[in-house]
Amino acid sequence: MPLQKNQILILRIERLSSDGSGVAHSADGEAVFVPGTAPGDEARVRIVKDCGRYAFGILDELLTPSPDRIPVDCPVAGPCGGCSLRHLDYAAELRAKQESVLDAFRRIGGLEVPVLDILPSPEVDRYRNKVQFPVGVDKNGAPCIGFYAGRTHRIVPCPDCRLQPGVLNEIGNALCAFFAQQGIRPYDEQSGKGLVRHIFLRRGAHSGQIMVCLVCTRAKLPHAEQLCIALREQFPAISTILLNVNAKNTNVILGGENHILYGPGYIEDTLCGVPVRLGPLSFYQVNTLAAERLYGVAAQYAQLTSDDALLDLYCGIGTIGLSMADQCRELIGVEIVPEAIESAKANAARMGEAVAAKSRFFCADAGQAATQLAAEGLHPDIVMLDPPRKGCDEATLSAVVRMAPRRVVYVSCNPATAARDAAWLEKNGYHAEKVQPVDLFPRTKHVEAIVSLQREI
């Protein structure tokens, strides 16, 4: 019998789903997904939607808490939704993420591949090097920073996000105070009025340099010079301030037009010893210390020799390939974002003449570039894949197979698509040897996975 809306069930949560919701089963065996619960919870659950084979519920009352539960130390963790696992002990969170990776490779990939023990993040809180605060108004009508409530564009004020370094929260609050003082209004999606849409901040984990980027609907910011002086006096680590123009009615945060208000327009940092320049459009892992663990594993799986050519598809600003440049004969990087490719070239140059001479970076779609390179007869020894969440399309994977690299290392932010793509490669001459989960996003549902694949034919 289908479950009814508002029906109350007493359920025991068995595990977490890939989106961080608790999973339980009704008396009839129907799966029920309940956000904000933990494995081992006994809970009174209210059904909000039945979809036939599964249903969604909300926590009505926690009857017996799981031993894995911890007090939630953020007052807006629920409505904000960014920290979907903030109620879980970190050891339990790691177990859940480990299980989600194992489940993806078994259920989606159909692969019985060894999934190694997950590598934890060195920092569980304050680990992010980037934040994009939407700017709205609080209950008193004053400008405020916050985050969108789940599946809405309603801003939940959040003056102290626990995932961000404290200084980034302080800068966001200081900017809002300046906006209030000067009568600068946040952008309102409904009316289309207002100026400031987002506050985009980056901080170098090793350098400490901070970039401030104000995303506005037009290119002129009132009292910009006064703002720059005030910010630099209060926060000496700020090394550049930019204004990004986004006048479109869109969910995309950044527009294509940047104006430098102060400094060089970028910050500098290092990742695995690679010097990097980061602007507003640079793709960069948000957890630097955990990313260094991730890239270290990728280098181990690549098993490079000094005679090898390394092809780095979806290379971003070049960090993962450049971190291995001293181990190979040649490095070729491909990325579709022009600014990222320019940064990759500059990063290679800053590593010295020897690295710059052996490195080539091309601005192109990774799939199209792989197809073209395969047609030209390129045969790299190692291919590094680091695609977006949607994974690789079949044309890209086919091109990789035609190039016949000795090894493929697949770095993924989505274990489901990694499992799918690894299964395709398994059917086309490659053996998935092992998978290493790495936690780059503590307190959230997200987990990275690295797949080591060896050519069999």
Feature names for model-found ranges:
Residues 2-7, 12, 18, 219, ...:
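Rossmann-like S-adenosyl-L-methionine
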Residues 1-72, 76, 361, 367:
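Terminal RNA-binding accessory module
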Residues 22-27, 146-149, 213-215, 344:
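Short, acidic/hydrophobic/Gly-rich beta-strand patch recurrent on exposed beta strands
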Residues 44-46, 132, 311:
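Hydrophobic beta-strand signal
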